[in-house]
Amino acid sequence: MSKHKHEWTESVANSGPASILSYCASSILMTVTNKFVVNLDNFNMNFVMLFVQSLVCTVTLCILRIVGVANFRSLNRTDVKNWFPISLLLVLMIYTSLKSLQYLAVPIYTIFKNLTIILIAYGEVLFFGGKVTSMELTSFIMMVLSSVVATWGDQQAIAIKASSLEDLDQELVESTIFVLNPGYLWMFTNCISSALFVLIMRKRIRLTNFKDYDTMFYNNVLALPLLLVFSFIMEDWSTKNLSVNLSADSLAAMVISGLMSVGISYCSGWCVRVTSSTTYSMVGALNKLPIALAGLVFFDAPKNFLSFFSIFLGFLSGLLYAVAKQKKIQQQKVLAATLEK
């Protein structure tokens, strides 16, 4: 009985679909919790929130280790030296994402964020070998196209609202914003740091033979000093601002979001380990679709043909990518069987 239970546990632990579903569920929960925290009145200390999340995650892991549920490597100089660049990239990725959203509209942000998928796909070719099939590339293009269509829908809604301002030269304003808006520079940095984070983490996992809990522990514990330093440099630590941001409600919400981060930290490392970094990134992009649908239903988001069509394109690109991956796996199995003969 225990043997069958052990085999079943091992099967789930190495299951791609199980890791993807768990990652999707945990990331949706994490998104909802984070949205609640940052929407608190006058909340402006994002790095403190991320610090609390990492701290709660680290403490939770230590407790799980004491009770015998989790097992991970203790901190040592070699692993810290090897993993520190990944933690630095993680902090850079989070910060540039926040700065991009500060200057860019969400649809524009999504367009450039989805370009990261293509960067990762070709980065995998350089790091790990293999190739990107034409079907995979088509799915990537469709994903970006869905974001472009969403932007058109958003701009269409804005144009209708601003139709009364007939004397305003919209093309001149938009072209000026594109040239002067620093959000595009932040977004470019975010795409590069996001791709490097996923690719280097996967390579380090292979080289160090890190397990899921090892990845989870090192990602969080090494991020703690970085997040605190970034917070001291970039955020307002005045007594007045601290009293607003560190109220009982905000602290409770941050602790809850930290517990949610335990799930997303574990599932992120699990998904990268048993699938691929491109699959992990693609799943992350597709995971925005339920939130997009919720935005159409519950929030003040554009509700027009282009908005719904962009969501349809997003799901279609996900299906195409899944088919492309299955075909590639089948071809690899056939090739391996041929070589064995």
Swiss-Prot record:
Residues 1-11, 68-85, 129-139, 198-214, 273-278, 325-341 are cytoplasmic. The keyword Cytoplasm does not apply. Keywords: Cytoplasmic vesicle, Endoplasmic reticulum, Glycoprotein, Golgi apparatus, Membrane, Sugar transport, Transmembrane, Transmembrane helix, Transport. It is found in: Golgi apparatus membrane; Cytoplasmic vesicle membrane; Endoplasmic reticulum membrane. GO terms for cellular component: cytoplasmic vesicle membrane; endoplasmic reticulum membrane; Golgi membrane. Residues 33-46, 107, 161-176, 236-251, 300-303 are lumenal. The chain crosses the membrane at residues 12-32, 47-67, 86-106, 108-128, 140-160, 177-197, 215-235, 252-272, 279-299, 304-324. The keyword Chaperone does not apply. Glycans are attached at N241, N245. It is a multi-pass membrane protein. Involved in the import of GDP-mannose from the cytoplasm into the Golgi lumen. Belongs to the TPT transporter family. SLC35D subfamily. NCBIfam families: nst. PANTHER family: SOLUTE CARRIER FAMILY 35 (PTHR11132). This is Probable GDP-mannose transporter 2.
